A protein has these predicted regions:
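Glycine/Thr-rich beta-alpha phosphate-binding loop at enzyme active sites
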Residues: 22, 28-29, 33-42, 177-191, ...
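Short beta-strand/loop segments at the ligand-binding rim of alpha/beta enzyme cores
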Residues: 55-61, 135-139, 206-216, 283-292
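A gly/proline- and charged-residue-enriched helix-loop-helix capping module
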Residues: 94-134
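Catalytic cores of alpha/beta
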Residues: 73, 222-231, 297-308
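Conserved, mostly hydrophobic/aromatic
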Residues: 13, 62, 84, 125, ...
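Active-site glycine- and acidic-residue-rich loops that bind
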Residues: 146-157, 216-233
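Conserved small/polar residues in nucleotide/adenosyl-binding loops
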Residues: 321-326
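Glycine-rich beta-to-alpha transition loops that act as phosphate-gripper elements at the mouths
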Residues: 64-67, 216-221, 289-300
Length: 338
């Protein structure tokens, strides 16, 4: 998308801007305007990755939340990413939390959201997956409905797992959104063991051979991360996605940031997510594949995630601030929208 259009979209509230951006991208793709408008990332000299039976054509993919309902698979896939992750999807549709629920902090290339797993539900997403002609690696991020109690919450994950298994190249279990009350309780030792045991049994029933990842919070202590790593290995999951958004705020942050509730993402998450990434990489001893996400907005920050121990990297928030361009491959930014 051209910079003038991107600048115009910034006059809308962040959630509306996000929806309009994706809609315009979809139209441009259908009309074969990507080349004319310079809408494509250049991943020149980037290496591929083979993991299990999947080939990631490059190391950069989109994070869950960008395309919650798998409505934009083709137009996002045509940008050149190595993989896409859609969702988070819940069994039943839900509208999420009241608006306004997304807040842009442009000075810091950061966003706070309290969306609350708003999505059109499992059936809608599955129908889109069935229709998709995307030939790259496609992951699906699954969650639980907000009104589900503890017992039903695990059932929600199993319902989504069964629903998407036929179509997902990998599945991500999202236990880390801060905007669904009680969801992060699944990080505790007993809860994570119960959840992953059920997921493991379901995997065997379905003979699901593709990778399963667990997406974690950046707000836990080292002991919790060690327990999670042990559980992920014990129940034969394949890796971790580090990290989701943070509810913690730096003391030096402005009052507008510290006073806004929700999950913080973008550049202000970068250091914190990197700390967790390094801890996870050090303690998993290369037994797990790690996907790094959080605050990547340059070539340097992309490669730093890889140096810290991730094999793949995801982006989302910084796509709200920049647009893909052919010049990206020749500048210090990696592509800038990373």
């Amino acid at each position: 998308m051209s910079d003038p259009i991107l600048n115009l979209l910034k006059f809308f509230n962040p959630e509306t801007s996000h929806s309009l951006s994706l809609s315009l991208l979809k139209i441009a793709h259908k009309l074969h305007l990507y080349s004319l408008l310079g809408i494509k990332f250049n991943f020149k000299n980037q290496d591929s990755l083979v993991f299990k039976n999947l080939t990631f054509k490059n190391r950069l993919g989109t994070a869950a939340g960008l395309d919650k309902n798998a409505d934009y698979i083709e137009c996002l896939g045509a940008l050149g990413f190595g993989f896409l992750e859609v969702g988070t999807v819940t069994p039943r549709p839900q509208i999420g939390n009241p608006r306004p629920r997304v807040f842009r902090f442009s000075k810091h290339n950061s966003v706070i959201n309290r969306l609350g797993f708003n999505n059109k539900g499992l059936e809608h997403l599955i129908n889109n997956l069935k229709r998709s002609e995307y030939d790259g690696v496609l992951g699906v991020n699954i969650g639980a409905n907000k009104d589900s109690n503890e017992e039903q919450r695990i059932k929600d994950y199993l319902i989504c797992f069964r629903g998407v298994a036929e179509y997902a190249d990998y599945i991500t279990i999202n236990i880390s959104s801060p905007n669904t009350p009680g969801l992060r309780d699944l990080h505790s030792n007993n809860n994570i063991a119960e959840l992953l045991n059920e997921i493991s049994l379901e995997r065997e029933k379905l003979n699901y051979k593709n990778p399963i990842f667990l997406k974690i919070s950046p707000d836990e202590d080292l002991n919790t991360y060690q327990n999670i790593i042990n559980a992920v290995i014990e129940y034969n999951l394949d890796g971790l996605i580090a990290t989701n958004t943070t509810i913690q705020r730096d003391q030096s942050s402005s009052s507008s940031i510290t006073d806004t509730q929700g999950g913080l993402s973008g550049r202000l998450l970068y250091d914190k997510s990197n700390e967790v990434l390094k801890q996870i990489a050090d303690h998993s001893k290369q037994n797990l594949l790690i996907i790094g996400v959080g605050g990547v907005d340059s070539r340097d920050s992309f490669y730093n995630k890889l140096k810290l121990g991730s094999s793949l990297v995801q982006v989302y928030t910084c796509l709200l601030y920049t647009s893909p361009s052919p010049r990206d491959a020749h500048e210090s930014r990696m592509p800038s929208s990373a």
